[in-house]
């Protein structure tokens, strides 16, 4: 066999191998369930005061790890302690009035019908009921005052990291207005966005390999759930409630991306997870 013939067949073999390799790579890219568009996520808990007041104690700093139940901050207790004392006094007065009304009603019940009318007896009994209602209201007011006093101590509802802390001692806390957030340390998960053409290769429970962009470390996880709805950008509704269908190019169709949620099987101690950072995901590996 001549050298020319060998070169000819060698060129053909190399070309065939290149075509097959290109086809395999293209098929892997288009069909294999993997994506570079993955995000680390975690649940965040807003720390929101239930009462208003000046912050007199702050036991945390930004990015600090806290445990569930730890005291985070304290709001000035003085006005709530005064409210509790006032509620206790109101309850004592209501109980005294009730005792007085009971004594009067009992006295009238033992009087002869010649000395008291049925109307007067009914009035005494109704007065007892009214005083009992006052006692119940005073007890409710006291419970509310005690609850508000307890809310001046804000504790961590979950274990996690303090984030976006700009609050300082002396700041005024408003009821219902978040002060900062806690990133739940036990809630980390991964969201991957996959083309719809790859969903047929993804099943709940399937293993996945998750590579962090931050330090190139690889974690193991599995498919937790698959999104069931995405926004349709092709249709909009106007004021006349008639669908506004956007025109498109018939021969160009972009695959929609669907969110898939992954649970992390185990996170090594030397891995730092940061919610919002990027990762790549390969399913079935």
Swiss-Prot record:
Record key words, sorted: Membrane, Transmembrane, Transmembrane helix
Gene Ontology MF, one: transmembrane transporter activity
Gene Ontology CC annotation, any one: membrane
GO biological process, one term: transmembrane transport
Signal peptide: none
Gene3D superfamilies referenced in this protein's UniProt entry, alphabetically: 2.40.30.170, 2.40.50.100, Helix hairpin bin
InterPro entries, per the entry: CusB-like_dom_1, CusB_D23, MFP_Efflux_Pump, RND_pump_MFP
Protein family according to the UniProt entry: Belongs to the membrane fusion protein (MFP) (TC 8.A.1) family.
Name of the protein this chain belongs to: Uncharacterized protein YdhJ
């Amino acid at each position: 066999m001549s050298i020319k013939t060998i070169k000819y067949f060698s060129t053909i073999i190399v070309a065939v191998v290149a075509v097959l390799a290109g086809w395999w790579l293209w098929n892997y890219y288009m069909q294999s369930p993997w994506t570079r568009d993955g995000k680390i996520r975690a649940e965040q808990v807003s720390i929101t005061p239930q009462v208003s007041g000046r912050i007199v104690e702050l036991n945390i700093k930004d990015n600090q790890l806290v445990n569930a139940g730890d005291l985070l901050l304290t709001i000035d207790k003085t006005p709530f302690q005064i409210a509790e004392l006032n509620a206790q006094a109101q309850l004592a007065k209501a109980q005294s009035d009730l005792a007085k009304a009971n004594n009067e009603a009992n006295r009238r019940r033992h009087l002869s019908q010649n000395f008291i009318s049925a109307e007067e007896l009914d009035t005494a009994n109704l007065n007892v009921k009214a005083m009992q209602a006052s006692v119940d209201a005073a007890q409710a007011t006291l419970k509310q005052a005690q609850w508000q006093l307890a809310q001046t101590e804000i504790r961590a509802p979950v274990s996690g990291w303090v984030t976006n802390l700009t609050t300082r001692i002396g700041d005024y806390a408003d009821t219902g207005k978040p002060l900062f957030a806690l990133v739940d340390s036990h809630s980390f998960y991964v969201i991957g966005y996959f083309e719809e053409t790859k969903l047929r290769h993804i099943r709940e429970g399937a293993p996945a390999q998750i590579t962090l962009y931050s330090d190139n470390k690889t974690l193991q996880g599995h498919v937790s759930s698959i999104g069931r709805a995405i926004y349709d950008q092709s249709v909009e509704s106007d004021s006349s409630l008639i669908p506004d269908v956007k025109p498109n190019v018939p021969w160009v169709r972009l695959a929609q991306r669907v969110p898939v949620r992954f649970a992390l099987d185990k996170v090594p101690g030397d891995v730092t997870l940061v919610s919002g950072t990027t990762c790549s995901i390969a399913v079935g590996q």
